[in-house]
Every structure is written in structure tokens, then in C-alpha cells.
Amino acid sequence: MGLEALVPLAVIVAIFLLLVDLMHRRQRWAARYPPGPLPLPGLGNLLHVDFQNTPYCFDQLRRRFGDVFSLQLAWTPVVVLNGLAAVREALVTHGEDTADRPPVPITQILGFGPRSQGVFLARYGPAWREQRRFSVSTLRNLGLGKKSLEQWVTEEAACLCAAFANHSGRPFRPNGLLDKAVSNVIASLTCGRRFEYDDPRFLRLLDLAQEGLKEESGFLREVLNAVPVLLHIPALAGKVLRFQKAFLTQLDELLTEHRMTWDPAQPPRDLTEAFLAEMEKAKGNPESSFNDENLRIVVADLFSAGMVTTSTTLAWGLLLMILHPDVQRRVQQEIDDVIGQVRRPEMGDQAHMPYTTAVIHEVQRFGDIVPLGVTHMTSRDIEVQGFRIPKGTTLITNLSSVLKDEAVWEKPFRFHPEHFLDAQGHFVKPEAFLPFSAGRRACLGEPLARMELFLFFTSLLQHFSFSVPTGQPRPSHHGVFAFLVSPSPYELCAVPR
């Protein structure tokens, strides 16, 4: 074929692509569609979004376009919701219509499929309901909300305090030890075991989980999700989710070992055994979500999400204690008055410790570790704040805009525990406190996270006073965004009280 013949073909292809592009963006011209930056042909707004610092980028777009604005990521329509009113209207008022998740094509690399969607990214439907119900009931049966699980956490808190004491007041980074303690609680629930803090496989698993988290954001990831045909190019597909794949491989080894010790005649000791029991019941049912492929995804969901979010919040808590020693002293005084320095903290103590409870909540608000939540998708046309959002639109809930809303919080950009105290010093929780999101897809691990945060935090401050190491500069209170917002690396000294 000569060059002359290729020119008309190229023109035809270009016209076809432009027509397809116009079809995908035609809703922008619909009445009451949210405003937003003008998308480029083919790319949409991919070049307008800084995926390395998305929360800041969205804040700038909010100032320009308002609380409800639209984006076009290649051919994927996206609406970003900002502020308490818009977020609650979408997730609570229209809870049934916004409970779906958008397809995430790159998760096929990890083994996601119609029968293996896990819990967190599962489409809204029978499989999600089945797994959500199973996860909640199993965690409850394993002791969530009961004294038995509380004892697991307090035992692990004692191990964590012993590990802190081993540093003998010398400077160290606390993040690794916090990861290990929180992960052991999750490992006990999912796999019925705890690991020693120096176990090589445990260290490898935690390292892969942390590195995998960084793969949850970035320009290439967004491009591959927006244009999934590019996943057929091995050179591109091989560059994403490498650590998450390695994490699942490591988890597969643990699950294989665990299955060898499972006795179906005995009551389940952990979530994995409960899942295996459901698999036995579901044999012969091709529609069931209880299968080998989904087991690894469900356990990975609970393990990685349950570990990273809570340990990151605790890391923020210790950072804020060394930056605000006056707050630290008030927490310790309340611990001494209510618990003392010998007895282990209990969840029953929380009702008598309003200041400590306020501090923990303010750590969550200020740390703002999941600023953009997890994406939702509309399953039918809805209206939010007067704007019409069509069926099939991806929704991003800017939780950071709620947790740091200047119209709600007295000092939104400062650490201020009094946000959660009334004039009499009683604990109060404003409606805008949404670190676990809201609606039907709110975090199912919230009760466990609240227990761990209280017991680990109070145990550490009961035993240690924390400070900035002598001669070191004052650490930054600015976070680092990589889907989660983690504290900038810092060291502290833990001096026994």
C-alpha cells in the first residue's frame, strides 16, 4: 500500500476517533452537568490532574469550579464531590444509587474477575453483599466488640511496648514497629497466627504491603485504567502492580500452609477457615463468591487495608505528640487518673477519657490519611447540589474537603483536639468527621480500627514519654501522598515513664 493510500485511511481513523471522543464527552453539554476544565481530545483531563498530589490539585479545581465539578479521564466521566453537604447527599441520601464501584481494569493483573472481586473493590450486587455480610459476621464471631479480641489487642500492645523499650530511649523510626503490631492483630483474625517481629517472611509481607500501597496512585495507573487496551502491551502492563502481585504470591504461601492444618470438623479459628467452610457449603454453585480465587482477594483486602490505615494513623499520633508536648502531657495525666501506670487499658476506660478520645479523633482528622476515599459509581441518574450526574459516572469523594472544611472546623489546618470537646470538656463528634467515609460502602473495619487506635495509643503513652531527639530539627507536620497520606519520615525518643 502506497503512502498516498495511507493518508485517506489515517484521515478516516482520525475522524472516527474524534467522533468517538465527542460521543463520550457529549454529556458535558447536557443541562445541569457539573462544570470542569475543558478536556483535550482523547486524553480528556489526564494532563490537568497532578496524580502525585491529587488532593492539592482537587482543592485548586474546587476553588475554580465549586463543590461539584467534573473531569474526563480519557473517556471516563468523573465527578468530584467536595464538602459535607455534597458528600452526604451522594453517599447517604443517594446511598443505593452510589454504592457501586467503577471497573478497575488493571486489577485483572492481580486475578480480579467476575467471581473474585474481594470486598472493597467489588461491584455492588449479590457477591458484594455476600462477602460484606460474611466479613462482618465472621469478625464479630471472632470477638470484635467482645472481650476476647480486646485481649488479643492488649497482648499485642504489650509486645509493642516491649519493642519500643528495647531502643532504650535512643532515636528510632516507629513506623516499622507500628506496622508489625497492627498486622499481627489482622494476621490473628485472618490466619489465626501472630508473627515474631523479626520473622523474615513477616518483614517481607509488610514491605510488599507498604510498597504496594504506593502503586495505588500515579499517572501510568490512571492511563491504563482509562485506556485498558494498553494493558495488552506487556512493557506497560509489567510496570504496574508489581509489589501487589508479589504480596499476593506471599499470601498464597501462607494460605496454602494454613489449609493443611484446617480441620473442617472443628469450629473456624479465623476468617480463612470460616471462608473455607463456606466454600464447602457452596460446592456445585457456580455463582457463589466463595471460591479459591476470591479467598486470596478477600484476605488480601482485609490484611492490607486493616494494617496500613491503622498503623499510619498511629504514626501520625506519635508525630503529633512530639510536636505538641502539652497535649501529650494532658493525655498522660488522664491515663494516670483513670487507668494508672500498672493496669492495662481497656475499652471500658474510653468513656471516662474524653480528652484522650478527642485527641485520637483529632489525629484522624488532621492526619486525613485517605483524603479521596475509595471511588464510587452511579448506578442510575442522580442529582447532587442541583447538578445532574448521569448513570455510570465515577464519583470521587474528597474527604479531605470535609475533614478540613473551614466552614465546620474552628482551626481546620491546625492540630486542635478541642474540635471534639464541648464547653464542659465532654467529648463530641461533629457530623463532618468522616475518616471512614459514609453510606453503604463505609469502611467495614471501623469498629476494629477504633479499638486498636485507643488501646495501642493509650498503652504507648501510659509507658513512654515521646520527644524529638536532641539535636534533630523539628519534624514536619506535612504528609506525603501516595493514595494514603503518611507522615514525612521522622525519628523520636521513647523514654520510659
Swiss-Prot record:
Provide the species name.
Answer: Homo sapiens (Human)
As for membrane topology, the entry says:
Peripheral membrane protein
Function summary: A cytochrome P450 monooxygenase involved in the metabolism of fatty acids, steroids and retinoids. Mechanistically, uses molecular oxygen inserting one oxygen atom into a substrate, and reducing the second into a water molecule, with two electrons provided by NADPH via cytochrome P450 reductase (NADPH--hemoprotein reductase). Catalyzes the epoxidation of double bonds of polyunsaturated fatty acids (PUFA).
Task: Indicate the impact reported for residue 297 to L.
Answer: In allele CYP2D6*24
Q: What is the effect of changing residue 337 to G?
A: In allele CYP2D6*94
Q: Which residues bind heme?
A: 443
Recorded hits in PANTHER family, A to Z, give:
CYTOCHROME P450 2D6-RELATED (PTHR24300:SF1), CYTOCHROME P450 508A4-RELATED (PTHR24300)
- Where does the chain bind substrate? 301
Known Gene3D superfamilies for this protein? Cytochrome P450
Cofactors demanded by this protein: heme
Q: Under which main EC class is this enzyme filed?
A: oxidoreductase
Q: What is the effect of changing residue 457 to L?
A: In allele CYP2D6*97
Q: Which CDD domains match?
A: CYP2D (cd20663)
Named in its record, the pathway it takes part in is: Cofactor metabolism; retinol metabolism; Lipid metabolism; fatty acid metabolism; Steroid metabolism; cholesterol metabolism
Gene name in the database record: CYP2D6
What this protein is called in its record is Cytochrome P450 2D6
